[in-house]
Swiss-Prot record:
One GO CC term on file: membrane
Glycan attachment points: N137, N147, N152
Coiled-coil annotated residue ranges, if any: none
Positions of transmembrane segments: 26-42
Name under which the protein is recorded: Uncharacterized protein L573
Organism: Acanthamoeba polyphaga mimivirus
UniProt entry keywords in alphabetical sequence: Glycoprotein, Membrane, Transmembrane, Transmembrane helix
Domain of life (superkingdom): Viruses
Signal sequence, renumbered to the chain: none
Membrane topology: Single-pass membrane protein
Subcellular location(s) of the protein: Membrane
Length: 244
């Protein structure tokens, strides 16, 4: 049962009795004012529980949203590229990706770097090294991060190198070292392409281009006032036109 009307009637009776002046004109004005004021006050108090309830519900919704487990916006994706395929044959994809990572990633400030030079160390006619390209590679197990962009989306890819031994059966069983590249990144679950497939294709293209750029060059050397100078005589690019 709604007690609002009973409360309003009781308060109106008490206020009219309290402020009665026995002057009909003044009492009439006071009655109108008191009734209007009490109606407004009682209405506000009757609406108060619903107002408080609405505020409480909104606060609780905010609290539940804040403390509920966050759904992951992105998922972790990992791929493994081994130097030996499943049938124990050389994996050319590994060669391309390894070339890209060791050629195009800056190792200048890395704390763990392996250095090697596998060619014969020789001097040229100017007493300078013929080949100054020292191989610099990451130490196995050391993680490194680089950014890869595809379709205007940038991915932060973490990678590291590792090895294991696999058994190869020919005329007899032999253990062979298998080199591994681990690649990991975070992707949007709604992504419409395979980021690692696109990345490895890019590595293959760049690796193939690097092989094409290694042109055969024939040089002639001329002694000019005691100093030898070299001139490119023939490259493989114009061999056909040269002998045509």
């Amino acid at each position: 049962m709604d007690n609002t009307h009973l409360i309003e009637s009781s308060l109106r009776h008490q206020f009219l009795t309290m402020f009665r002046t026995d002057n009909a004109f003044i009492d009439g004005i006071l009655t109108v004012m008191i009734i209007s004021l009490l109606s407004y006050i009682v209405k506000q108090f009757s609406d108060l529980p619903s107002v408080i309830g609405n505020i409480y519900n909104k606060i609780m919704i905010k609290i539940r949203l804040f403390f509920r487990p966050k759904s992951a916006d992105k998922i972790s994706k990992t791929t493994i590229i081994e130097s030996l395929s499943e049938d124990k044959k050389p994996n050319e994809l590994y060669t391309a990706v390894y070339w890209f990572l060791t050629t195009n990633i800056d190792l200048t400030v890395d704390s763990n770097v392996k250095m090697s030079f596998t060619k014969k160390i020789e001097l040229d006619e100017y007493k300078e090294l013929k080949d100054k390209n020292i191989n610099k590679n990451m130490s196995y197990g050391t993680k490194k991060i680089f950014n890869y962009t595809h379709n205007n989306m940038t991915f932060e890819i973490e990678y590291f190198f590792a090895t294991n031994l696999v058994s190869v059966y020919t005329d007899k069983k032999r253990d062979k070292e298998n080199h591994i590249i681990y690649l990991t990144t975070l992707i949007d679950p709604n992504i419409r392409f395979d980021v690692f497939e696109e990345f490895t294709k890019m590595c293959m293209r760049e690796y193939a281009k690097s092989l094409v750029d290694k042109k055969w060059v024939q040089k002639i050397f001329t002694n000019n006032n005691g100093r030898w100078t070299e001139t490119v005589f023939i490259t493989d690019v114009n061999l056909n036109s040269y002998f045509a």
